[in-house]
Amino acid sequence: MRKIALLLFIASCIICKAQIPASGKVSQEKMLERFLSYVKIESQSIDEPSMTSFPMTDGQREIARYIYNEVKGLGGKGVKVNLSDDYYVYIDIPSNIKKKVPSVLFMAHMDVTPEAPGNGIKPMIHRNYDGGDIKLPGGITLSPNNPQCAHLKDLVGKTIVTSDGTTLLGADDKTGCAVLITLVEELIKNPKFKHGRVMVALSQNEDVGKAAMRYDPTVFGDKPDMVIDVDGSTFDQYSIANFTAIGQTYYFTGNKAHPSYGKKEQYADALTAASFFIGLVPPEMNPSAREGKEGYIHCYSLAHPLDESGKSNVNDYVVKVRLRYFDQQEGAYQKKLMEDCLQKVQTAFPFVEAQKTDDQMQYENIAYSMPDYVPDMVKKAARDAGMEMREKYARGGTTSAMMVARFPDVMPGGSDFYSGQNAEHSCYEWACVEELMVLVNATENIVTSVMTIKN
């Protein structure tokens, strides 16, 4: 099926390329101005332990209102812009052609990670980069010899944006926001650009794993035919698959007794039972032993549960476990293995009440629901814009993966596409303005390529 889609796609490339409008409608300086306006709004999200809470900072509200007003000011016939109560921004641009073609939903997020300092961001512009070290006032140096900054060696003569070294920059994912809003502007202001329906969703709390929690799957009405998640951090790769992520929680309920009379008094040693449980997981399944397309099992937390008042229950223990896998058969194996581990604990420690809560689907593999034509389309769209990209299996999750897990019936899997962010979640974070312009062209190519696919 994928081969047929590829042949149809290649056969239409000449037509597709001819329909792409000339670039340069939005200047590089305007792109820089847009990106700087976003990163100056401090929109760090808050990482609360509860998976049901959805905290919102003033900065998150501010950037959502800013982008909403920016897009509203662009006008556009039939263009709908919505700012939700949870400060998601939804943009719906209708098709301007008669032919029915697949719709495209682009995604990015407006919040910034809380994992690095994010107050008092002072972006710095380094024009005509000379290929050497970039020394920042905050005392850190961005060097092309550092793996985080190795891509700098490819960008001699370009314009690099950093923080002052005391905070992160916010390129994750305000590069994606800048690219997509520029795409929106070009679609609105250039009626000669023929396209199908294009939608954009900018989410909140992605960097704390909650982007899908308040997404409104009804806001666009119909299910999008394909999704592109503009939040990638590897300039020469795009994802075609990612881990399925399952969260498991195991409770071990104990009671104190004098250990000298432990059997008689039915001593429930929850600590030893929980430790025994963790030790039953084969070490070859630990993340430290896995790579490539191999999944893993990670018992990553052992702690006392909290009562309603927030006080620790010292007799009991909670073990939290991550299951990660690409292949559904491996996932079935992991779940069965953990069931067996639990049964062995129940047999070995009959006085301890050992039980598991319901599994929590954290994110799903995009490969299961991604249309066959998407990977080759993305690769060619990038190539035509001047970027060579290769497929990757992402050992993690994305906004699209979270959406697919929460809304499997209305959200297809979407490729995670490079947004221009580098050294994310750190004070070394940086972006290249010229790359953002190239990425706008790449997203334009995707929009145009869709018109060659039969819906």
What are these regions (language model features)?
Residues 271-292, 296-300, 362-415:
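Active-site-adjacent substrate-binding region
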Residues 240, 262-305, 312, 329-354:
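Acidic-enriched catalytic cores of C-N bond-cleaving enzymes acting on peptides and small amides
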Residues 49-101, 105-107, 111, 122:
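A non-catalytic alpha/beta surface segment that caps or lines the substrate-entry region
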Residues 152-243, 286-311, 319-326, 454-455:
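Acidic/histidine-rich catalytic neighborhood of metal-dependent amide-processing enzymes
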Residues 26-58, 161-162, 361, 420-426:
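N-terminal capping segment at the start of a domain
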Residues 1-19:
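Bacterial Sec-dependent N-terminal signal peptides
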